[in-house]
Every structure is written in C-alpha cells, then in structure tokens.
Swiss-Prot record:
Pfam families: Cytochrom_B_C. The chain crosses the membrane at residues 36-56, 95-115, 131-151. It comes from Eucalyptus globulus subsp. globulus (Tasmanian blue gum). GO terms for biological process: photosynthetic electron transport chain. This is Cytochrome b6-f complex subunit 4. Keywords: Chloroplast, Electron transport, Membrane, Photosynthesis, Plastid, Thylakoid, Transmembrane, Transmembrane helix, Transport. Disulfide bonds: none annotated. GO terms for molecular function: electron transporter, transferring electrons within cytochrome b6/f complex of photosystem II activity; electron transporter, transferring electrons within the cyclic electron transport pathway of photosynthesis activity; oxidoreductase activity.
Amino acid sequence: MGVTKKPDLNDPVLRAKLAKGMGHNYYGEPAWPNDLLYIFPVVILGTIACNVGLAVLEPSMIGEPADPFATPLEILPEWYFFPVFQILRTVPNKLLGVLLMVSVPAGLLTVPFLENVNKFQNPFRRPVATTVFLIGTVVALWLGIGATLPIDKSLTLGLF
C-alpha cells in the first residue's frame, strides 16, 4: 500500500494534455542554469550578509548572565518545548503524559493514509489534513502559551 498518488489516465483533460506533450512541468523556465547559478547564490549571500550585518550592528547578549548563586523560582525549558512541558505539567499520571506525547507523531503519521483517497493537492480540498493541521496548530499554541503561566491559570490562559 503506497501513499504515492497515480494520475487518473481516464481523465479526458489529462489525456488531452499528454497528447499535446504537456506533462506535469510544461510551463516556466528551467532551473538550470538560471536559478542554480544566478538566483540562489545571490539569495544565499544576501542572507549571510544580512546576518553578519545584524550581528555586527546589534551584538545583543542571549539571556541573562549566569549566576551560580541565584536559582530562578521556576525553571522553564526552551520555547520549543513549552507544549510538551505543559502536557507533562498538567497530566497527573506521567505514563499518560508520555503516551499523549507519543500519540501526536503517531496521529500525524496516519493522516496521509486517511487522505489517500483524495486526488487533490490543494489544502482546501483536503478537509481531513487541513483540519488536523489547524487543530494541531491551535492546541500547540494554547499549550505553549499556557506553559509560561502559573499552573492554576495554565489551561484556561487566565481567560475563563
């Protein structure tokens, strides 16, 4: 069982395009040499120049200086671990918290198999994948913001 979608050769529009010699890439200009030799190096060097320029002009420190004699009241992880930290903080059973964290990638792995019957690539015509993405984004943002608040306000974000 593959996830790769095969073209519908019974579609008359696709058959007409194939008869004219127009496959999936019949438009635009080739990537070699235009993009690879001229545009990509300019973009890469421009990005490096912007980063170096900002580092020279604004050498800001990252965080507070370390003080081994003063421990903060609450130790928080890095920002990208906030949703996971919030799950572990609010779920009373640690095994259940670990299972919830494992269920996120397992659920994301099932989405292509649920959406395999749909032949469209447009996200607005793929309701299951779009719904999973939007709900997952909202839940991740909700958990991430809640992890920065005290435990009594973390699930409601202090709104309710």
